[in-house]
Amino acid sequence: MVDVIICEELKKICPEMTLGCIQAHVEVESSSDSLWKEINDYCEVLKKEMHIEELASLPRIKEGREIYKKLGKAPSKYRLSSEALIRRILQGKGVYKINNIVDINNLISLKSKFPAGSYNIENLHNPISLMIGKEDEQYKGIGKEQINMENIPLLTDSIGSFGSPTSDSERAMITSNASEILMCIYSFSGKTDIDEYLKYGKEILEKYANAKDIKIKIIK
């Protein structure tokens, strides 16, 4: 299992910061009709059951927003990826169809309300840590320009930063040539319910990505 630690500096501000990690060998391909139906069906459930005004008060999103405020980041400008994804759906914009791994990642995030990110292990270089973004820290987000990552919880390796609960970098993004992934679920409120979604993640990775050699770890 890839070794990931949470830095003490971040723990002081967010003592309950937790990462739920899944490492697996997978087959990256276009999402099957059955996976895409599962995603679309859940999007319809969200549209029926939720109003956009309620988003910021959902416990897992609210907890993340409060930590961002403590870190000095405006949570409405630097939204959690789970909040941004659900907002798109409630605005009628739908979900981007990328590949089965990214789409599974998004489904887990939609259902759990936790931000989640998936990374190509081949492009990661130990040691890996979750830390607070330093002054002038930035990277090119997936489908975005350079993003100011200062004072945001940030996954970094020996080369630099590559992921966060807000937006991931292009360096470790999942493309068709990825064969082994690290999927991270970000919780600002401890391990409660992370077990449930790690189990769910394992199941749908096996079902829709032929995942093998699956390892699961909770990091606090």
Predicted regions and their residues:
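Charge-biased, low-complexity intrinsically disordered regions
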Residues: M1-K220
